[in-house]
Amino acid sequence: MTEHNIRNFAINFGPQHPAAHGVLRLVLELDGEVVERVDPHIGLLHRGTEKLIEYKTYLQATPYFDRLDYVSPMNQEHAFCLAIEKLAGIEVPRRAQLIRVLFCEIGRLLSHLLNVTTQAMDVGALTPPLWGFEEREKLMIFYERASGARLHANYFRPGGVHQDLPPKLIDDIDAFCDPFLQVVQDLDDLVMANRIFKQRNVDIGIVSVDEAMQWGFSGVMVRGSGIPWDLRKAQPYECYEEMEFDVPVGKNGDTYDRQVIRMEEMRQSVRIMKQCVAKLREPAGQGPIASVDGKFAPPPRREMKRSMEALIHHFKLYTEGFHVPEGEVYAAVEAPKGEFGVYLVSDGTNKPYRCKIRAPGFAHLQAMDWMCRGHLLADVSCVLGTLDIVFGEVDR
């Protein structure tokens, strides 16, 4: 009998692969069709964000957060603003809190629509992305009408938001909600009930409760395994404790469960949006949209054009910026991808001493090797799609 020396086959997956979701490069070690090892190579989109923030004032550093998870930009700004507000003890007016929560939920819809439909495309369905992008376009227009930008909004500011929402926009967001629920139902029927989609996703990339905790997962990745952990319920920030919504939880911890949870989260987000719209219309929802403390919130532009004092005030805040008391703080939000945290260290000057960004996608990608081991090559794109990775935040 002759001895055969069997050597595993190594291939590159990405960074120009349509299912790589950006600039991911995976070096796969294959034994036939079976994946033996996955080696993610990251850093192709590294821009040194954390270091750049140290050279900018707090107000100038906010736009960097739009460029992390650029699929749902406002959710990242939120964490940074919360960190500054905790350190400086800034009181955020109620109307600003409602607007923030409303746009964070719009961001969640933007992210989940992209993820669920592109993951369906990765396994061979062509219709869902077209439907999903049609709805995303409407939501992008809401972003544009609120902040003037479709993508990099720079709308959340320390102490509140940049400008108020016009009443017509609030009406249009209200009118968007119910028809959107029908689209979610159509997507559910088309994708989640599809036999082929189930065959490709059920029992793939299973994560148990203990494993989810050990890997440091958050967001949908832990909820898919059956842990009802959602920062909006567990550690409510802004006005989330007033909102009524459910936290969907999976039971098998596979890629199919995680996608079903994302579909249900979209319905819950619409519930929160409707409550925000109703509260914004009430008399209690009227009032200022930024902190009334002039040390932190610049005057509105229309006032700046009329008053010399407002112009000086505006100029001072945008050039020198405000000084934040010495200290360190961690602020986290339930971003669409998971727990997005900002660890901010202040030395009492007008610039952050250190700003550590805890990106959920980074923690999820490290488990790629462990999740894919023993699966077939075709399952790699299913697992990758369900991790919901955007490289802006992984590479920072």
Curated annotation (Swiss-Prot):
Membrane topology: Peripheral membrane protein
SUPFAM superfamilies: HydB/Nqo4-like
Keyword annotations: Cell inner membrane, Cell membrane, Membrane, NAD, Quinone, Translocase, Transport, Ubiquinone
Subcellular location: Cell inner membrane
Reactions it catalyzes: a quinone + NADH + 5 H(+)(in) = a quinol + NAD(+) + 4 H(+)(out)
One GO cellular component term: plasma membrane
Family named by the database record: Belongs to the complex I 49 kDa subunit family.
Known function: NDH-1 shuttles electrons from NADH, via FMN and iron-sulfur (Fe-S) centers, to quinones in the respiratory chain. The immediate electron acceptor for the enzyme in this species is believed to be ubiquinone. Couples the redox reaction to proton translocation (for every two electrons transferred, four hydrogen ions are translocated across the cytoplasmic membrane), and thus conserves the redox energy in a proton gradient.
The protein, known as: NADH-quinone oxidoreductase subunit D
Organism: Methylobacterium radiotolerans (strain ATCC 27329 / DSM 1819 / JCM 2831 / NBRC 15690 / NCIMB 10815 / 0-1)
Gene behind this protein: nuoD
